Amino acid sequence: MTETFQFKLLAADGNARRGEVVTPRGTIRTPAFMPVGTVGTVKAMYLDQVRDLGADIILGNTYHLMLRPGAERVARLGGLHKFIRWERPILTDSGGFQVMSLSSLRKLNEQGVTFKSHVDGALYHMSPERSIEIQGLLGSDIQMQLDECVALPAEPDEIERAMEMSLRWAERCKVAFGDQPGKAMFGIVQGGDIPRLRERSALALRDLDLKGYAVGGLAVGEPQEVMLGMLDVTCPVLPADKPRYLMGVGTPDDILKSVAHGIDMFDCVMPTRSGRHGLAFTRYGRINLRNARHAEDTRPLDEQSSCPATRDYSRAYLHHLIRSNESLGGMLLSWNNLAYYQELMAGIRKAIEEGRYTDFMAETMEGWQRGDLPPV
């Protein structure tokens, strides 16, 4: 078993990259989609199912896990991998995004952020050092720096202030992380929708010589072209021999286009959240199972899929479950959606290897635009 953390670039097609992130707990095939296991569970899914779908890594949320059950308790129980029965790599976010969203419950300064728990109102302080300590107690394989994510739109001065403080926090996180063989700490590029700030952030983080780099503060309501424009500014500045992670993204369309701009890793709650609300992602595009047109449709979502939820259950039954608010409906659609996301990533990787990513993008988007088959 390797004791090192490394990124191997295996192929490229334009700016799209096919690689591997090698860790002691397993290899992450990139481009990769990481299902979100916020509180130690990918909602509505058994982790055995998530594993069988082809996920090489999942994400855990530092903010939620530090509040309940508590990082120290997880450590006493053997770490997050043992606690949730997941032997493959885990990435933990820093908790910063959730804390920053508690605008009425938190106070921010150079030392960190003090906030009230949304669970019981207890007061907590999270510094860059404490964030890394918590992630260490959880035992994750990839840990994220604490950063300040400014909601867009925002004034340029406010975006710049938050970006500069995030850079100082990145330096403190690097010191706190130290040298942990087989593990990595990623820095997070900030700068809102201002190209010069994105470039400044990426250059400064590159100089820290971290093991990986994330792009944060995007997919927060700005137009897709703005997000892609920020990737155009950011990715060329980041080291080619380190993985690039676009945080919180996103839709299949976002992923497809972001890969073409040089991104290697993604995470988003969209597959499971959408599933719980009756939405299915398929190669025909997005299907709303709440719609009455599915009430007597005996076809599955996609008979060619290898996922049982996609292949074996009729749309009429899925429609019935969703309209009846049965939990099984959300479970089956979450299963379908995560299966589709992993199938999409497998197709992306294969297309890059074959040097036909542009064609793959066009074919995939054409399938979405063509849409679902006519109702029976």
From Swiss-Prot:
InterPro entries assigned to the protein according to its UniProt record, in alphabetical order: ArchSynthase1/Queuine_TRR (IPR050076), TGT (IPR004803), TGT-like_sf (IPR036511), tRNA_ribo_trans-like (IPR002616)
Query: Could you give a GO molecular-function term held by this entry?
Result: tRNA-guanosine(34) queuine transglycosylase activity
**Where in this protein does the record put region RNA binding?**
248-254, 272-276
Protein EC: 2.4.2.29
Annotated GO biological processes are: queuosine biosynthetic process; tRNA wobble guanine modification; tRNA-guanine transglycosylation
Q: In which pathway does it act?
A: tRNA modification; tRNA-queuosine biosynthesis
Superkingdom of source: Bacteria
Which residues take part in binding substrate?
D93, S94, G95, G96, F97, D147, Q190, G217
Q: Which UniProt keywords apply?
A: Glycosyltransferase, Queuosine biosynthesis, Transferase, tRNA processing
Spell out the reaction equation it catalyses: 7-aminomethyl-7-carbaguanine + guanosine(34) in tRNA = 7-aminomethyl-7-carbaguanosine(34) in tRNA + guanine
Q: Which residues form the active site?
A: D93, D267
Entry GO terms, CC: cytosol
HAMAP family per UniProt: Q_tRNA_Tgt
Q: How does it assemble?
A: Homodimer. Within each dimer, one monomer is responsible for RNA recognition and catalysis, while the other monomer binds to the replacement base PreQ1.
Q: What is the stated purpose of this protein?
A: Catalyzes the base-exchange of a guanine (G) residue with the queuine precursor 7-aminomethyl-7-deazaguanine (PreQ1) at position 34 (anticodon wobble position) in tRNAs with GU(N) anticodons (tRNA-Asp, -Asn, -His and -Tyr). Catalysis occurs through a double-displacement mechanism. The nucleophile active site attacks the C1' of nucleotide 34 to detach the guanine base from the RNA, forming a covalent enzyme-RNA intermediate. The proton acceptor active site deprotonates the incoming PreQ1, allowing a nucleophilic attack on the C1' of the ribose to form the product.
Give the family, as the similarity comment puts it.
Answer: Belongs to the queuine tRNA-ribosyltransferase family.
* Protein name per UniProt: Queuine tRNA-ribosyltransferase
UniProt organism field: Rhizobium meliloti (strain 1021) (Ensifer meliloti)
Gene name linked to the record? tgt
